[in-house]
């Protein structure tokens, strides 16, 4: 009975060590991914105009020539929308 108890304790310790290692690995992966910029922030200026979802204050600043208050739109919406 003592051997079974010791075996169960060793198994519990090994499982908890494995769980801790997996948790650390997941945290490291999350930290790596959180350092990357989201796709909208990866766009850059092309030829003096701001690409999609870039910051803007007027239509002429956007490559699509469509500024929606603070961000460039992918394309202008038809006027009848």
Swiss-Prot record:
Q: Which cysteines are joined by disulfide bonds?
A: 49-63, 56-67, 62-72
Compartment(s) = Secreted
Q: What is the purpose of this protein?
A: Gamma-conotoxins may act on voltage-gated non-specific cation pacemaker channels (HCN).
Under the GO molecular function aspect, what terms does this record hold? ion channel inhibitor activity; toxin activity
- Top-rank taxon, per record: Eukaryota
In the record's own words, the domains note is: The presence of a 'disulfide through disulfide knot' structurally defines this protein as a knottin. The cysteine framework is VI/VII (C-C-CC-C-C).
This chain's source organism reads Conus textile
By sequence similarity, the record places it as follows: Belongs to the conotoxin O2 superfamily.
Keywords per UniProt: Disulfide bond, Ion channel impairing toxin, Knottin, Neurotoxin, Secreted, Signal, Toxin
Assign the protein's first listed, main location to one coarse class: secreted
Propeptide residues per the UniProt entry: 20-45
* Name of the protein this chain belongs to: Gamma-conotoxin-like TxMEKL-0511
Kindly list the GO CC terms recorded for this protein.
extracellular region
InterPro entries of this UniProt entry?
A: Conotoxin (IPR004214)
Signal peptide positions (record):
1-19
């Amino acid at each position: 009975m003592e051997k079974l108890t010791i075996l169960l304790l060793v198994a519990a310790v090994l499982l908890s060590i494995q769980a801790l290692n997996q948790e650390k690995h997941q945290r490291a992966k999350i930290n790596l991914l959180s350092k990357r910029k989201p796709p909208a922030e990866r766009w850059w200026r092309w030829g003096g105009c701001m690409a999609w979802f870039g910051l803007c204050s007027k239509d002429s600043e956007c490559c699509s020539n469509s500024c929606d208050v603070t961000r460039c739109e992918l394309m202008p919406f038809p006027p009848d929308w």
